[in-house]
Regions:
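Hydrophobic structural segments
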Residues: 1-100
Length: 100
């Protein structure tokens, strides 16, 4: 018989000021999902640092600064962001899919 897995799909608002703020929100969401019995926690694409929402509302020539900020805040794998999320997953005994 197939084993059932409880999955949590997380939708959260990133901290647009700092990737660290978003990572804190991700770690809190992991703990909350695990407390509710989730075995797999899934986050949206590019949740860290954040989704380039401005691509839909600004012409490309006006988005250079935001693109540079995304580049500067890009997640390095492995690195501090993946280390923190991995530690939270280990601590709660769950699997995490994080879009970076």
């Amino acid at each position: 018989m197939a084993r059932k897995v409880r999955v949590a799909a997380v939708q959260l608002n990133p901290d647009l000021d700092t990737p660290t703020g978003t990572v804190d929100r991700v770690i809190t969401a992991i703990a909350d999902a695990a407390a509710q019995g989730a075995e797999l926690v899934v986050f949206p694409e590019t949740v860290v640092p954040y989704y380039p929402y401005f691509s839909f509302v600004q012409p490309p020539m006006m988005s250079g600064g935001e693109h540079m900020r995304l580049y500067e805040n890009a997640v390095v794998v492995p690195g501090p962001v993946t280390d923190a999320v991995s530690a939270a997953a280990r601590r709660h005994g769950i699997v995490v899919m994080l879009g970076v």
